[in-house]
Amino acid sequence: MFVVSNNFLFTIALDCIQGYNFLEPFALYLKKYFQANPKLGSRDRRNIRQLCYAWWRLGNAGKQYSDVERMAIALYLSYEQIDGFSERIFKDEKLINSILLHPKLKYDLLQQLYSLDLNSSDIFPFCDLVESELPLDDFIYDGFLRRNLWIRIKERFEKETLSSFENNKVDFKIHPSSNLSMQLPDDFDVMNSEPFVKGWIEIQDLSSQQLGSAYDPKPNEKWLDACSASGGKSLQLLDMQSSIDLTVTDIRESILTNLQLRFKRNHIRNYKSKVVDWSDANSTLFRSESEMYDAIIADVPCSGSGTWARTPEQKLSITKEMIQNFSELQFSITNNLLTVLRKGGALYYSTCSVYKNENIDVVNRLVNNHSLELVEQKVISVIDSHADTMYLAKMIKK
């Protein structure tokens, strides 16, 4: 294997990783770790964080190598800049000079130079369950890279937003799919920017924006956002058609509180908010839901496998049983939601999973058990833009 410098930060990062028990998000665990080790400077913390996340992104691959070698492989595949840290770690100039290449090209170079052998199914778990239309290798190796920072510009504030960012010399990019989808620098302080403070933009991943663009709201229709979370899709929906009669629900009041704060910032007051457990057909809250809706958004709980580039530690804790449990929960939720969807109404089923058990398998089960027409289903994959991967199916109730 190639020679690397066993930097002392490797030892700290490995100690941090070995102490993690998967009971909380790694980001929260790492924050506590740094608080317990205040002598680590900001540069060391940044490098340790990068080492840890690189390690998780490698998944279970390369276990035939030592921990130090695995750490170096992971760092090389995921590192995106030439700096003093990378130059101290890698001794081979070919590695240093190629560090800006795409991870797949870097892996090919490691194969050529050192006969490196990594199995894709070890980098990403249960590849046999992944949606067939997803370009698997591209998806897996893109997972070594951080997600880009995307915002959605509200159409009526497009000129003001562009002017503000241009005046402040912000290095932004507009995505070719929409002049309202903008990429900002990863380290940009969005929440203190003029467009955010004035409510001209929303932080929303590109794939989520593209999913929301499939909604087709008509004036005065009744819409239900059943698993509303922080309300990003509802906000996009209201920007498309402000006159809809909107109800948002979720399983906990605390989730809806966050949504309400976000709606308040956007001066949105004309909506209904309810705590409902849609997975429980016998729930009092469920049985009290008597309205019929013209359209329902069911962005259901899932494995989150399309977002694991953000939380790569989850690749090491997922099991097939967990994926199947999500599938059963998703069917239960949507099965109950169909009771409040009027005939001719649209059900928008979505996940941020790449596993077919949670996507087309659930949709096929719904279509086979109900009078539904599947009019559209797709994997939303914008790999070249380093965004999340999502799934969407639109069904009409007959």
Where in this protein do the model-derived segments appear?
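S-adenosylmethionine
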Residues: 1-398
